[in-house]
């Protein structure tokens, strides 16, 4: 055992397991990402994993209404939106090794069984599934990280999460207590009728973990209001956690990017380093504090209309919302995002007229396409700044072909296979694809920008790399392309071989940029994406040009928003 410990201390990375209790959607992703940022700020290299209990191999085929956004990594893996938080907060590069689901784990085990890997043995949850999960934990060590944070989805007590929790329990035993830290995120609700906070749900949640052999080292308590010390002491006593390791995580009012600062005040990172027997290096202050100040005390204000198909759930466009906030910080502005259902816009075009800028995000299927095209036409004709993303770019091409060139039946073959002007068509390599999951054009691809394009000015480069998630592209038919360009639609970016059109723009327009890729996936608070900063800057200028002073929101507005 002593030899194993010595070996671990030399080469073994440290693991932090983050679990959740009482209710779902507590913010494990934000908490995990914030902790990763704090540890990184103290000089440690971090890597992050998300383990989801659902049986889909990945979330790529799931409805946005059920799952929210599908976040795409550079290496082309479709993942949970929490990986977006990891990349935005901690600045880590997530990969396929960052995302595991029960479906992926079971699929791997069953494939091995079919190949005879288990030599006729009876395949069971323990040890085969749990061993596969532990292999997933170990795969993260290839990143070379000092500390690996593993967020386990679901709620303690759910049957779906049990294999992951059991694997984590075994893993601690195998690598040593000094190399692991268990953090349990729980809810301390406030009952208005009783006028008090309740700790009992958290006690029961920890009891669920203890029943399966997991004893949390740190308890992080989500709450609407300050938790009195006597309540924290009570939780420490009944949950068998050191008093200094019961951490309050109160709701932040203005910006989610204030969470790392609040957790730092509670010394969460120090408690973790103590548990992992790691040195407490001086924290390296970055521009994070100034970013939070810009987010909470903006000088200017503008409104961006987001014309989408899935606006009923904000998480469906999570990275888009965040990228707009990053762009707002870069422009010292508060960005009010007005979500407009594309189908409603078809019935009531006036919905968009108060916007200083327009954003058309991605999506699939024909529903709402006419509404998106109506928004694009309004932006084009009235010189309103516009950014189109993925389907948004395709709609920009369709609208231009219909309303400028007069090709009234111009369309995508996704929506109309019989159109005589298929300006958007299925990519050649997609035409023989029959399965849905994981078969799109996914991940980072290089793009060459036209030297004289506005896009090149925004990026300050003619060579870029962006993440994709689509099957359809601008039709490479030379006649279509020639006519569209002749009419004024500039091809601003293509694949390096020039065959795939990745960006289009209008020259005689204050800001009209459309891209086939998803720039929102690469935007960071510390490195906002140029296409979004350009949109917000143009929107502020548009507001000023229209005689509306782009000043900061009034105190009354701020209070209303806070509620």
Swiss-Prot record:
Among SUPFAM superfamilies, the record links this protein to:
Class I glutamine amidotransferase-like (SSF52317), P-loop containing nucleoside triphosphate hydrolases (SSF52540)
The record lists its disulfide bonds as: none
Q: Where does L-glutamine bind?
A: 65, 363, 391-394, 414, 471
Q: How is its activity regulated?
A: Allosterically activated by GTP, when glutamine is the substrate; GTP has no effect on the reaction when ammonia is the substrate. The allosteric effector GTP functions by stabilizing the protein conformation that binds the tetrahedral intermediate(s) formed during glutamine hydrolysis. Inhibited by the product CTP, via allosteric rather than competitive inhibition.
Name the GO cellular-component terms: cytosol
Specify which residues bind UTP according to the UniProt entry for this protein.
Answer: 24, 198-203, 234
Q: Which residues form the active site?
A: 390, 518, 520
What reaction does this catalyse?
UTP + L-glutamine + ATP + H2O = CTP + L-glutamate + ADP + phosphate + 2 H(+); L-glutamine + H2O = L-glutamate + NH4(+); UTP + NH4(+) + ATP = CTP + ADP + phosphate + 2 H(+)
* Binding positions (ATP): 25-30, 82, 250-252
Q: Which GO terms describe its molecular function?
A: ATP binding; CTP synthase activity; glutaminase activity; identical protein binding; metal ion binding
Q: Which InterPro entries match?
A: Class_I_gatase-like, CTP_synthase, CTP_synthase_N, GATASE, GATase1_CTP_Synthase, P-loop_NTPase
Q: Which residues are in the Glutamine amidotransferase type-1 domain?
A: 303-545
Which GO biological process annotations does it have? 'de novo' CTP biosynthetic process; pyrimidine nucleobase biosynthetic process
> If you read the UniProt record, what top EC class would you report for this enzyme, in one word?
ligase
Which keywords appear in this protein's UniProt record, sorted alphabetically? Answer: ATP-binding, Glutamine amidotransferase, Ligase, Magnesium, Metal-binding, Nucleotide-binding, Pyrimidine biosynthesis
Q: What else is known?
A: CTPSs have evolved a hybrid strategy for distinguishing between UTP and CTP. The overlapping regions of the product feedback inhibitory and substrate sites recognize a common feature in both compounds, the triphosphate moiety. To differentiate isosteric substrate and product pyrimidine rings, an additional pocket far from the expected kinase/ligase catalytic site, specifically recognizes the cytosine and ribose portions of the product inhibitor.
Q: Which family does it belong to?
A: Belongs to the CTP synthase family.
Q: How does it assemble?
A: Homotetramer.
> What's the protein name?
CTP synthase
**What organism does the UniProt record list as the source?**
Fibrobacter succinogenes (strain ATCC 19169 / S85)
